[in-house]
Amino acid sequence: MKQHIFLVEIGTEELPAKELRRLAQYFTANFINELNANGINYNDINWFAAPRRLAIKVNSINSIPTKSYMEKRGPAINKAFDAEGKPTPAAIGWARNCGITVNQAERFTTDKGEWLIYRMLVETKPVQKLLCSMVYNALTKFSSLTKIMRWGEKNYKFIRPVRTITLLLDDLVIPGNIFGIDSNRIILGHRFMGESVISLLHADYYPNVLLERGRVIADYELRKDTIRRNIEIMVKKIGGFTKINDKLLEEVTSLVDWPIVLTASFNANFLRIPAEALIYTMENNQKYFPVYDAKGKLLPYFIFVTNIESTNTNQIVVGNEKVMRSRLADVEFFFNIDRKQKLEDYLLLLGQVKFQMELGTLLDKSYRLEILASWIAEIISTDIKQAARAALISKCDLMTQMVFEYPEIQGIIGMHYATLDGETELVALAQKEQYLPLFSGDNLPTTLVSCAVSIADKMDNLAGIFGINQQYTKQANDPLALRRAALGILRIIIEKQLPIDLLSLIDKAVFLYNKKLTNTIVVEQIIHFMLNRLLSWYKKQGYSIDTINAVMAVYKPTGKLIHFDARLRAVHYLRQIPHAENLTKRIFNIIAKHKDLINGEVNFTLLKQPEEVILINSITQLHKKLILFFEKGKYQEALWELINLREIINTFFSKIIIMTENKELCINRLNIINKVRQLFLIIADFSLLQCSKEKSNVD
């Protein structure tokens, strides 16, 4: 069967740069689905994307689709034939609808039985007659991915207005009309360089013709790599280093057809401004790449990418430096206005900003945070005064001009202004770290003072929003960042090993709202919500659901959260030891079967066998030791001590008849076993563990 190369290029107005890769990959995925649905085999497929085009090149595509069959299942054999083996009316009617006789039908068998079936060969069309409709189908699915524009008299809909449609199978133009445009072999080159209109003779020539004649690097990855390599070359020339922001690199790649990388500079006096503000305006406003020294300090240079090759690059550099100077002058202006007063002077202005309509102002929140952070600081044994100070001024930078213009650097600006005001290093750092972690897997606050402020801020948000029943916890997204806040609190407490219990923390946060909250079950709801987040977090870490549930069953919110973590790790450890897991299963299963017979304490006067005496004495002695382990959160050590009773317990089971006819003895022996079970229950409810082994990929 002859194989061909197929090319489709959709020429458009400028596509959204931040979405270009996603759009190209989505178009490709849609077209692959069309190929598969039509039974068309191919070798491989390449996608191309540039600011004004999306393209796909399919290599070694078959000219004729593979044969496909349409199946029509008939009645089951036991209903298709009567006792004499003659077709029933049901079988005859089904066959008539298929245009065959019952004798022409095939049979197929599954584990559920045998049926009649009719397989009909579906008539296939040549690939040439399918390609245009396949492309159209792939393009019309974009409305589910992104915002769509409308244009033309017939109100065509696509991401951006379409100007050209190129469909080539080898050197043959595939006829068709998409968005009111007839397909042809015309592709457009660079707007200002090379050939603006190119007639493409063969599908295989596509990327090279655009490169050589059109001055367009259609290959997205090649264009991106070209930019990256040239940035590194230019940075070395000025003796600097760069931290290439991949999101910025992706966006710049999507903005240019023919990338030319150049270096420019700005006045070093601007470096007195907080570096993050300069970097923000360079990367986000101008799409420039900052340059750093070997220690990571910002240098007065930047790298930029232009979309045109010029004999006078100096003019381009000067133009970009002029734009950059204006941008940095704006930043300097905002900075100078802000520094006319101290950070703490913005505190009372927070009284003019609502935190939430029913929850008061940001000033109210700041006073709550001051108290809550102090309370947390005392529990975790860090500096109470510094935690209180950091929390009180933590929202002040929200009232500054800098944060108003560049909201993404809130907290960072607070840190710099606090430092300039002479606040302690701990207080200043907490301004930045109060928002950590920003996302799943993000870094945590580095100091205990920062931890106290971060937990206080997140817990205040949860208490307030749940307290007025404004939570949206069932939505796929997280509009009020409640899930993120809950997970942040949990991660900080557990990973930093802070001795905080959830119930006290939630109670304190709710109490500080001073009766503003209307939800009477707010504490219970927050606990339930946070424990669900805890379960999800541990699942993602590789713990099995039954292990988590076993610990969750005995955990009380009044207990320290770090003890939950210690219990979980202990149970996970136990599940790697087969004989240990078998021991717990045996103990819990016996009690589960005879729980109605258990009546409490062991009667020592009924101990008749030495194995009974040895076991109960061992339990009594061990209990005192375990209490110390439990108080210190050493659950793995405690569990190991319990497992070390294995030989004594196994001897008890092998030598003692538990279900003896003497009911009094029977109950007493069950009480002994229950004593062992109760010690295990302090750690987890092992009866909830399934037979499957715990995953071993947990850190």
Swiss-Prot record:
GO terms for cellular component: cytosol. The keyword Nucleotide-binding applies. InterPro entries: DALR_anticod-bd (IPR008909), Gly-tRNA-synth_bsu (IPR015944), Gly-tRNA-synth_heterodimer (IPR006194). It catalyses: tRNA(Gly) + glycine + ATP = glycyl-tRNA(Gly) + AMP + diphosphate. Coiled coil: none annotated. Its EC number is 6.1.1.14. It comes from the Bacteria. PROSITE patterns: AA_TRNA_LIGASE_II_GLYAB. GO terms for biological process: arginyl-tRNA aminoacylation; glycyl-tRNA aminoacylation. Its main location: cytoplasm. The keyword Cytoplasm applies. It is found in: Cytoplasm. GO terms for molecular function: arginine-tRNA ligase activity; ATP binding; glycine-tRNA ligase activity. Keywords: Aminoacyl-tRNA synthetase, ATP-binding, Cytoplasm, Ligase, Nucleotide-binding, Protein biosynthesis. It holds the Pfam family tRNA_synt_2f. Tetramer of two alpha and two beta subunits. PANTHER family: GLYCINE--TRNA LIGASE, CHLOROPLASTIC_MITOCHONDRIAL 2, GLYCYL-TRNA SYNTHETASE. Belongs to the class-II aminoacyl-tRNA synthetase family. This is Glycine--tRNA ligase beta subunit. It comes from Baumannia cicadellinicola subsp. Homalodisca coagulata. The gene is glyS.
